[in-house]
């Protein structure tokens, strides 16, 4: 069962009820939660484009708690973040693993954060294929292209060399918030709002 809390706002004209995520969207906060897949990615993209149309000069805030997921779905979020005029601030709450770690790292420089006990994990893309040998070879070539692309993007956003990223993504590499700052995945660990 998926229960979503509601909030009630009162003003001079009466009351209005919102689900909590719609209310937070008014504050330009978008949640990236759970496995990244096409449906979820499309919702996030639609929210970013909507907020850009509302005010292209104001920041958008992505709150991330995700184990990662489908690379193409994550890349659609990544590409939209780069495409829109708004600066996108990212905050890891819980975990940002795999594709979610790239989304976290690709926030606006100086506006990439994590909470103190959040975990961040990078690794190479995962895949599997079956079928004829020719089809398996095609999929192998494609996943190697994706791996190269992911290494280049992580290198761009962290400042680490492609060689270091390649070595560090051979297996799961976990970071605490402070370790992620040193590595360049985020800019700061935050403990409270100011």
Curated annotation (Swiss-Prot):
Signal peptide: none annotated. One of its GO terms (molecular function) is ATP-dependent peptidase activity. Its main location: cytoplasm. Its EC number is 3.4.21.92. GO terms for biological process: protein quality control for misfolded or incompletely synthesized proteins. The active site is at 98 (nucleophile), 123. The keyword Protease applies. The gene is clpP. Belongs to the peptidase S14 family. It is an enzyme of class 3 (hydrolase). It is found in: Cytoplasm. Fourteen ClpP subunits assemble into 2 heptameric rings which stack back to back to give a disk-like structure with a central cavity, resembling the structure of eukaryotic proteasomes. InterPro entries: ClpP (IPR001907), ClpP/crotonase-like_dom_sf (IPR029045), ClpP/TepA (IPR023562), ClpP_His_AS (IPR033135). Pfam families: CLP_protease (PF00574). The keyword Hydrolase applies. Cleaves peptides in various proteins in a process that requires ATP hydrolysis. Has a chymotrypsin-like activity. Plays a major role in the degradation of misfolded proteins. One of its GO terms (cellular component) is endopeptidase Clp complex. This is ATP-dependent Clp protease proteolytic subunit. Keywords: Cytoplasm, Hydrolase, Protease, Serine protease. PANTHER family: ATP-DEPENDENT CLP PROTEASE PROTEOLYTIC SUBUNIT. It catalyses: Hydrolysis of proteins to small peptides in the presence of ATP and magnesium. alpha-casein is the usual test substrate. In the absence of ATP, only oligopeptides shorter than five residues are hydrolyzed (such as succinyl-Leu-Tyr-|-NHMec, and Leu-Tyr-Leu-|-Tyr-Trp, in which cleavage of the -Tyr-|-Leu- and -Tyr-|-Trp bonds also occurs).
